[in-house]
């Protein structure tokens, strides 16, 4: 990794100069441990590994060997190790059917293990937008940081962190589409103003089916928002037969009163649930 874990989150902060920290592996014992005794890092932010790239890495390792050992820690099960860093190397070695792999054993807590895995992958810049967003969210949770503080420690803009985290508010089908590279991150961000998941998923299908570009997607979002503002007026309930009979009877009675010489002032108002009839009789 380009920077030591302590430089990011304050564990043993300033005990070492960065130059020394970058070469920690030279000071630690490298052991050969059984490949089958290693389990994946449960905090690994990467969920998709390219088989093609693993094969390419395996060919490189077959030719040149492993230049940088993997990093592991002991698990509760005796003789078993959990990966901290180096899952791609471990997967490549498995395809080569090696029995052992060079490793450094660390005494890391869950928090440290998760943070190292997240930071290592973020530095490689190979995560999908969704994986990156989950990594930021996990680091914020693990270290109780603000977005601004996390951005400073990772050397990124706060807007970068915020934009990635917004993607996690999108419905699962949209997130899956990003992961599967059916749409771009910019397509996904264009869907955010729609807010209603059903609208976002509907437009997602249209983007994929019609191969809409980002500008076309943004235009569709604007149109959908305008259509949503023009809400149709609620339909008035049709009069039932009993209601019509009642109103006709009342009107006939009022007409008879007026025929007798009494001047009436009447007003009828129709509401959603009822009809209001106001009668004023001068004194």
Curated annotation (Swiss-Prot):
GO process annotations (BP): chromosome segregation; division septum assembly; positive regulation of sporulation resulting in formation of a cellular spore
Residues in the DNA-binding region annotation: 148-167
Subcellular location per the Swiss-Prot or TrEMBL entry: Cytoplasm, Nucleoid
Gene3D superfamilies: 1.10.10.2830, 3.90.1530.30
One CC-aspect GO term: cytoplasm
Keywords: Cell cycle, Cell division, Cytoplasm, DNA-binding, Septation
MF terms (GO), sorted A to Z: DNA binding
Classification via InterPro entries: Chromosome_partition/occlusion, HTH_ParB/Spo0J, Nucleoid_occlusion_protein, ParB/RepB/Spo0J, ParB/Sulfiredoxin_dom, ParB/Sulfiredoxin_sf
Annotated segments matching region Disordered: 1-21
Alphabetical list of SUPFAM superfamilies matching this protein: KorB DNA-binding domain-like (SSF109709), ParB/Sulfiredoxin (SSF110849)
Disulfide bond residue pairs: none
Entry-linked HAMAP family: ParB_Noc
Role according to the record: Effects nucleoid occlusion by binding relatively nonspecifically to DNA and preventing the assembly of the division machinery in the vicinity of the nucleoid, especially under conditions that disturb the cell cycle. It helps to coordinate cell division and chromosome segregation by preventing the formation of the Z ring through the nucleoid, which would cause chromosome breakage.
Family: Belongs to the ParB family.
Name of the protein in its database record: Nucleoid occlusion protein
Natural source organism: Bacillus velezensis (strain DSM 23117 / BGSC 10A6 / LMG 26770 / FZB42)
């Amino acid at each position: 990794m380009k920077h030591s874990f302590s430089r990011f989150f304050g564990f043993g902060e300033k005990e070492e100069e960065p130059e020394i920290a970058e070469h920690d592996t030279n000071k630690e014992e490298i052991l050969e441990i059984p490949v089958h005794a290693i389990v994946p890092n449960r905090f690994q932010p990467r969920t998709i590994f390219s088989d093609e790239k693993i094969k390419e890495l395996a060919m490189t390792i077959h030719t040149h060997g492993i230049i940088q050992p993997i990093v592991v820690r002991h698990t509760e099960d005796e003789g078993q190790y959990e990966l901290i860093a180096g899952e791609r190397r471990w997967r490549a070695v498995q395809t080569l059917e090696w029995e052992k792999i060079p490793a450094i054993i660390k005494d890391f807590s869950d928090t440290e293990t998760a943070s190292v895995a997240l930071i290592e992958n973020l530095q490689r810049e190979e995560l999908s937008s969704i994986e990156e967003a989950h990594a930021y969210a996990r680091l914020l949770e693990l270290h109780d940081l603000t977005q601004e503080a996390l951005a400073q420690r990772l050397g990124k803009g706060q807007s970068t962190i915020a934009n990635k985290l917004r993607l996690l508010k999108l419905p699962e089908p949209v997130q899956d589409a990003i992961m599967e590279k059916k749409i771009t991150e910019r397509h996904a961000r264009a869907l955010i103003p729609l807010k209603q998941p059903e609208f976002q998923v509907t437009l997602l299908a249209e983007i994929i089916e019609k191969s809409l570009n980002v500008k076309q997607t943004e235009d569709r979002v604007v149109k959908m928002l305008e259509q949503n503002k023009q809400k149709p007026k609620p339909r008035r309930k049709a009069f039932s037969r009993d209601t019509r009979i009642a109103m006709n009877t009342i009107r006939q009675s009022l007409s008879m009163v007026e025929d007798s010489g009494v001047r009436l002032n009447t007003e009828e108002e129709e509401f959603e649930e009822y009809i209001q009839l106001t009668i004023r009789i001068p004194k």
